[in-house]
């Protein structure tokens, strides 16, 4: 796959609160404070900085300045540093992160490229499945489709998908749906409508998943948006192409 071309989206969302409860990130994420530094904490260890790159899979809480922060989820990338929790981005990486969160698709592409040195190339057939799953969360890509696309028996196909993307097939589908719903809510969509559009069983199902993966409940996130006028930061970029969603 050529440099800069990836099937993975980079989802940008506002964080309109001053604290996130304990939760693990599903994928690698860049947090950028709007006014002052951010602190992430886990098991007595903390990392503070204006822009932080947070390791996925580690349960952590977050303290933010009074204006909150923004986050870009770098889907498909492996955390490239040895730090157990997070690293503060400085210099050009910090500038790229700020530009990316501001809506600069070229900056998002370059940021991904500079952080991709620990990520293996994605097999072309897995990329096809990833594109299909991210394009429309209402389209239930099945294990049978995965098996046919990869031309492997089921167990091997599921292992191949996890090894290639870093997530199980089921978790990748759930995470893709959650990002879609979060983007809708960031543009002031009703929770029940966002849940339906993203394929969740009901509002309660979306609320449980949202809380466990983001560290706050949807109602708190939406209430926080009412106190800020930065909701237009919510975007979903497919790097290497035009933005798929610009929700401004």
Where in this protein do the model-derived segments appear?
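N-terminal regulatory/effector-sensing and dimerization cores
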Residues: 1-85
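Helix-turn-helix/homeodomain-like alpha-helical modules used for DNA recognition
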Residues: 14-22, 205-224, 235, 239-248
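Short, Lys/Arg-enriched N-terminal segment that forms or immediately precedes the first helix
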Residues: 14-16, 110-118, 158-165
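Alpha-helix C-terminal capping segments
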Residues: 30-34, 38-41, 60-62, 95-102, ...
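Amphipathic alpha-helical segments enriched in hydrophobic/aromatic residues interleaved with Lys/Arg
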Residues: 78-136
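A short, Lys/Arg-enriched amphipathic alpha-helix from helix-turn-helix/homeodomain DNA-binding modules
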Residues: 113-141, 147-150, 171-190
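Basic/polar phosphate-binding segments, predominantly the helix-turn-helix DNA-binding elements
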Residues: 144-173, 195-220
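Terminal helix-turn-helix DNA-binding modules in bacterial transcription factors
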Residues: 163-201, 224-248
